[in-house]
Amino acid sequence: KQKIEATGNKFVKRGETLTFEITTTFPAFEKADSKDNVFTIVDTPTGLDITDITSLTVGNAALTKDTDYTMTKDSATGAVTIDLTKYIGKENAHAGQTVVVTYTAIVTAAEGTADGGIYKNTANAYRNGTETGGDNEEGWTGDITLTKTDDAENEKDRKQLNGAEFEVYKNFEEKDGKVTANEADKLYFVKEADGVYKLALSKDETNATSTVVATNGTVQVKGLDEGTY
């Protein structure tokens, strides 16, 4: 049996770092000491960028990267291959032992993009190229639409204002009809299209801006987690 789990809330924001854990079983090989034996775990993410393996254990042993196993990442798909072939040993020494891989990934998903604002993580284990188990985990990001109108007395007569500018904050305070927010809570976005922005991975991301501009009076901001803005 194999499973993959994410820790924490599954309703996340773009740029958030998540921790995942893959649990599987070290396989037994029919020809125990064959030099052709291979054991790999392949993790294929959508809306995620896998960054690092923080730990890998087999049974009670903590393995060392590049000594006991290797990790390679496909630059085109982002898929990560963990190759444990070095650790197979002789006479099926580790067969049946529990394998636990803990690693981190950054959320890149946003509503309206190819991933649809949903991150997915699929892990499969392979013995000599044959799949021995697989599992997947998923979560999502949210979005809000902001609207700016003129101040006509009758609401039905109000017109949406093209070019209206907004700054978006989280963790603000409201008292006596006034809203205050800390500069540190200001959010930064990257423009995708007119009136459409996604949360920046950081304020230093290329073309990141704290000002979002409405088209025909509305602007959509994506990649948000749960909260009040």
Where are these regions (language model features)?
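Solvent-exposed loop/turn and edge beta-strand elements of beta-rich ligand-binding domains
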Residues: K1-Y229
